[in-house]
Amino acid sequence: MNYTTALPDFIEMQRVSFCWFIAQGLNEELNTFSRIYDFSQNTEYVLFGQEYSLVKPIYNIVRAKKYTANYSAQLVIPLEVRNKKTNIIKYHSKFPIINLPLMTSSATFVINGCERVIVSQIIRSPGVYFEKNKHQKKNKKIRKLISSEIGKLKSFTPPSEILPTESRLYFLKPTIKKKLISDKKKKIRFIKKEEYWNWKGESLNIYSFKQIKDYEIDFSTSFVEHFKVYNDLFKIRHLSTKIKRIKIFLKWLACNNKFSLPNKKHLIFLLINSFNLLSRTIVKYKILKTRNNENKNDFILNDYNQIKKVYDQVLQESETLLSLNINTQILSFILRDLEKFNQLNNFNFLKLNITPKIKVIIANDKIKSSLYFTNSFKELIKFKYNFTKKEKDKKRNQSQATIFKNKTKYLKTKSKIIQYKDDHLIRDIYKKKYEEKELYTATLIPEYGSWIRFGFQKNTKINISKYPIKNQEDEIIIQLDKVTQKPIIHLLKEMGVTDLEICQNLQNSEFFYFNKPILTNSIHQPNKLLRFNLNKNYYKNISEFSRIFDPSYYRLGKIGRSKLNNRLDINLSKRITTITYEDIFAIIDKLITLSTAKQISDDIDHLKNRRVRSVGELLQNLFRIGFQRLLRKLRSQTNKTYSSQLSSFNIVGATIKEFFGASQLSQYMDQTNPLSSLTHRRRISGLGPGGFDRDRISFAVRDIHPSHYGRICPIETPEGQNVGLIASLTTCARVNESGFLETPFWRVINGKVIKNRNPIYLTADIEDFYKIAPADISTNQENYLTKNLIPVRYKQDFLTVTPSEVDFIAVSPIQVVSVAASLIPFFEHDDANRALMGSNMQRQSVPLLLPQKPIVGTGLENQIALDSGMVINAQRAGIVESVTANKIIILEDSGRHYKYDLQKYQRSNQETCINHRPIVWEGEKVKSGQMLTDGPGIISSELSLGQNVLVAYMPWQGYNFEDAILINERLVYEDIFTSIHIERYEIEIDRTAEMSEQTTNNIPNLSISDVQNLNEDGIVTIGTFVKPGDILVGKIIPKDDSEQLPESKLLRAIFGAKAKGVRDTSFRMPEGEYGRVIETLTFNRRTKLAYKFEKIQIFIAQIRKIQVGDKIAGRHGNKGIISRILPRQDMPFLPDGTPVDIILNPLGVPSRMNVGQLYECLLGLAGHKLNRRFKILPFDEMYGPEVSRILINKKLRQASIENDEAWLFNPYSPGKMVLLDGRTGKEFDNPITVGNAYMLKLIHLVDDKMHSRATGPYSLVTQQPLGGKAQHGGQRFGEMEVWALEGFGASFTLKELLTIKSDDMQGRNETLNSIIKGQPIPTSGVPESFKVLVQELRSIGLDLSTYRIDEFSSNQSYEIELNLIEKYNPLLKTFSHTSNINNISF
């Protein structure tokens, strides 16, 4: 077996998918909806889905196409309707639910007589994907000037609000035990139930008492605490509360700073830095106290300047201050009473004599340290007591009573204290682990249901007392759409999961829980949890988020389950297709792990994360939607009769009809030629329901991905806005049962390619784990790799390894590209953009009358012709018994006769001609699957889309400027580029109740020659050649009496004339169309007396020769328009006298970089001279460097020797030859590249584009002529054309174009009238588009008025307002007189 040409069945994907749907998919859906209940739950509909049957179609495929019907089978299911209360069966019978369109053997559907294709869809695979947030704000580090402690403090304190409100001021009960820790410099007591700790020390990474003992700790007042408190006091708007709060704060501050502490230089430095903020607060407070002052502004300015001056001075002297041993703190000035404070004229406390003053203040101040000002619940509750040796015993006796007595001094309510155990202190690991995390988002894509997102979110609404975790800025939320979201723990608790369960199921539980939750509802404590101390009533109402666990709303499917198991390392059964708690826990864990480990997020464009939904699965989803609609309809119907309820089953059929008729994925089949129809069925679309939206999609999705190798073609994709969203399957790719794309490879073991078995198909995710060599690696006869170093792909990267390390090798060089691209010879020498155009333009090639097989091909032509569906293949082996133009009869081995009907001159969807020509003869033995006929663009079993013509690359009198093409008249006379096009005209007979049209050949006021080609029924006879204006169907309609004048009625009454007049409403051939009638079809409706025509179809065949304006192209993206047809004698000719057929511009090659066309035309010339054809596979470097060039040179040399024509090969300029000018007979100056290229005629024919308009329809709103040939529109005089006229100053021409020739309604009517009467053309008015603009501006609230400016005179206004919109004077409110002329509208 030659492995390079052994390709799979090209439309296997579609056929297998539909067969799966009929056999299995349909069954699955019918089982899901086997029992349906109505609204009252009394009536039950039982569908016996296992026993469904398909009734044979009424029309076969040929008849369905001919009579514009559907090729569909009736789906019949036994249905039972019974009343549940009474248990009475109302109905039990086989019920026809829908007409299911059936797939033809060539993977198409016949809907309304047209062949349609269901394009496969590529979508994101169900599963979970983790993505790094693109716009993550990085935490800004505080400048190092403020010392390293600030960074620690910042990460340590929460970002939430800190206000001295009741709920955040906490006290101790008198029963608490005490423990003393001695220190050399001072004694500090820690109050401890199970554990307490004062976090205000300088070493912020200490979390246990053991560590405290090892350090000498100074429990000084924290700057951050002051800073945060002041910051929040600023935010209070209500003045009286602000004053109260500041008072409380000042008193508390006084308590905390009672004792002078040893000097700490960094502390002073920190406080100096915060001084600016504090000074502003003081000024504000002063203003509050003195707000009745008259000279308030002066006071503020004066005072602020004074403070600012001091502040600046302090900054300057900071170094001096730090060098002195100041045993104090700068903040102590706030300790004074506010009255005293206001009296201070200068800041004496900054001087060195501050210590005695502090002592005085302390002596006067009687406030005890009864108030603890906490930042949030998350800090460990602490109180600080300082003792001297003398006071120790006295204080010990009094302290408990004092605390208890004073604890409610400033509070109205009591607050509970949350207690902790020693062994569950916040650990250093938490801070290290989550401080530097990166934010990720997880997206869970179910097979059915909306996407679910999990992500980190800053908790802005956090209630401090309920969230006591250090550094907990983010929480994980679950999001169903852009609006609905909630914290994930809320959802789990809603569903009844206890905290202990949550904590035990999460590996990263410390992200949520700062100690291990004890069982809830404990006797001693209502809730041991720290973070989720929420009101229990909150969990009583279950939200819509609980739906994610409901299979009727969200379903993962088998694929989603296996993907989830693999990605999250969980081991759930594949039968569990719903989302479970275990999935949620695993996703949370993975999300936290990724954010801390900072791993690479998933590549959503990798093919392992995208799957293909073929016809079968799309239809299965459609059935599900249909049955769900039925369910809703039956449940919404109450008190309906049972027969009307049965009729509501039609909704399923309507859903199917809607999909085949209107869905983005159901497309009108491209039948231009066999290749276009084949590639259309192999197309993969990213658009459609559940897919991408082409307006919002990024470049990353459209781009080529390494995993596309051998699965999706990197070349064939549309140009324009769909680029990259619509792709094509490669030649060898197939879709596996899960919907993932696979491609074949040969196994390589120890450097030997194993080819004796079938190739191994690998999916994209498995392929990443192996080292895979490309197909263009040469092997010897024993299939061993010959090179020492082999380039391989491994994990989407390129490596070079030894042959023994290679695991797989690609099957074929054309494995990478699609069917259309694989037809381009030498395409490795073309730029990718041009190869893309080449593969797209081959699909637009028109099947020619006399096509030729390409001299230079690639070897796929036969396979494409076979799988295209445009030829007839033998169903079984046998012997041909008879062959005619219309049918082939084969005697099978079993003795049965099998008749094959050939299509003769049938119209395709693109109006090209489908015609079968038999290629077998009587008595020939045929095998199963063998081609019996040729089709359009197929000659002797090979795809032949164009013609081999002699091409020269040279300029010729400027006629090939800008890709224009010169052709020889031989191409016209010898019908080389002639094609047949079949057009269908549909004429409907109007049969209204009063006046019915009749078809007849007896039409009044026509000569015999006008009606001689009509039959008795008035229909044109087959074989007639019709020209524009010829009658196709003769129709008349009787004139109504009401239309007649009274005089004629009187005359009829006097003379007794009974005959009424008739009006001619015949259908005539449109302008610019011509051709021969090849078929007429009539659609009848039987009445009591006779058949009456309802609709008549007439098929007309045109033979179109090539002409100026037609588009032709090569296979390498070298397209052009024919600019001139030259006589043979004027064309340049070869030394042997052969004139060139086509002249192309040589400038089209270097900039386009499609050098493949030169290789093709030169090898084509050699093949033409040697009478030999070549099949060239791409990527020839495997045989040696520059093999293509060597092959061509050798073949040209061989041709020149065999034909004894030395001019064919010049070793000094190979491929170029001397040409002679046909007009003069002289040689051209330089040798010219000449060769046989394969050229295609494209469907963009000038006959279809030619269009003219005199008068025609106008747009309703703008009153401008419509655009386009279909609307009989005009040519748009666009912006650039207006610039051209403006540049020449042609103002009158411009005015004419913008008004009377366009949208000045009154002006154009008056102009026509004056032209008819021979009067001068009147002045133009205001264009309608200007009026529309005025109205649009008014609709958004801008009143734009228009004025007429008259000659200036002092006694009257020279500006008169005009109303352009309505024809009346707005001042008089009376309608103005309209023009005398009659309005003539077109």
Curated annotation (Swiss-Prot):
PROSITE patterns listed in its UniProt record: RNA_POL_BETA (PS01166)
GO cellular component, one term: chloroplast
Localisation per UniProt entry: Plastid, Chloroplast
Pfam families for the chain: RNA_pol_Rpb2_1, RNA_pol_Rpb2_2, RNA_pol_Rpb2_3, RNA_pol_Rpb2_45, RNA_pol_Rpb2_6, RNA_pol_Rpb2_7
EC number: 2.7.7.6
Top-rank taxon, per record: Eukaryota
Family annotation (InterPro entries): DNA-dir_RNA_pol_bsu_ext_1_sf, DNA-dir_RNA_pol_bsu_external_1, DNA-dir_RNA_pol_su2, DNA-dir_RNAP_su2_dom, DNA-dir_RNAP_su2_hyb_sf, RNA_pol_bsu_bac, RNA_pol_bsu_CS, RNA_pol_bsu_protrusion
Disulphide connectivity of cysteines: none
Keyword Transmembrane: no
Keywords on record: Chloroplast, DNA-directed RNA polymerase, Nucleotidyltransferase, Plastid, Transcription, Transferase
Catalytic activity: RNA(n) + a ribonucleoside 5'-triphosphate = RNA(n+1) + diphosphate
Record Gene3D superfamilies: 2.40.50.100, 2.40.50.150, 3.90.1100.10, DNA-directed RNA polymerase, beta subunit, external 1 domain, DNA-directed RNA polymerase, subunit 2, domain 6, RNA polymerase alpha subunit dimerisation domain, RNA polymerase Rpb2, domain 2
Known partners and oligomeric status: In plastids the minimal PEP RNA polymerase catalytic core is composed of four subunits: alpha, beta, beta', and beta''. When a (nuclear-encoded) sigma factor is associated with the core the holoenzyme is formed, which can initiate transcription.
Role according to the record: DNA-dependent RNA polymerase catalyzes the transcription of DNA into RNA using the four ribonucleoside triphosphates as substrates.
Family: Belongs to the RNA polymerase beta chain family.
Name recorded for this polypeptide: DNA-directed RNA polymerase subunit beta
Taxonomic lineage: Eukaryota, Sar, Stramenopiles, Ochrophyta, Bacillariophyta
Gene (name only): rpoB
